Amino acid sequence: MKICTWNSQGNPLNDAIKLNILNHLLTIEQCNVVMIQECGQFILPAQHSGRYHYVVVEHAGAYNQRCNTCIIADLNFVASIHYLISGTGRSAICLNYNGCNIYTLHCESGSGAVGDIRDL
């Protein structure tokens, strides 16, 4: 299983270089699961929609769409998806993929991350 995590610092679809990175992860590397933090208002590009499923969750308390979290996963192996809220209000996604639980969370910077992780 190939898993990748990436803080794209904004929607990859709005930047040609970031879009090339995303396409590389999904086509060349053929990652089974790609987790993106700060993905903006992400929509899965049409050329990948037949094979992949995606989930986008807004962070609670965020004042813009930049801090959204996204998981892109191969459709054939996704068993379930759960949404969690950390102690600081940040959202997390848990994906059961082929029997493995995979989590993504965009933690607060600094010491806030300890509370985010501990309270899940």
What kind of feature is each model-predicted range?
Residues 1-49:
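N-terminal, active-site-proximal structural segment of metallo-dependent hydrolase catalytic domains
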Residues 8-15, 81-83, 111-113:
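Short, flexible loop segments at the rims of nucleotide/cofactor-binding pockets, characterized by
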Residues 10, 103-120:
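Active-site-proximal segments of metal-dependent phosphoesterases and phosphodiesterases across multiple
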Residues 33-108:
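Structured beta-strand-rich core segments of catalytic domains in phosphoester-bond hydrolases
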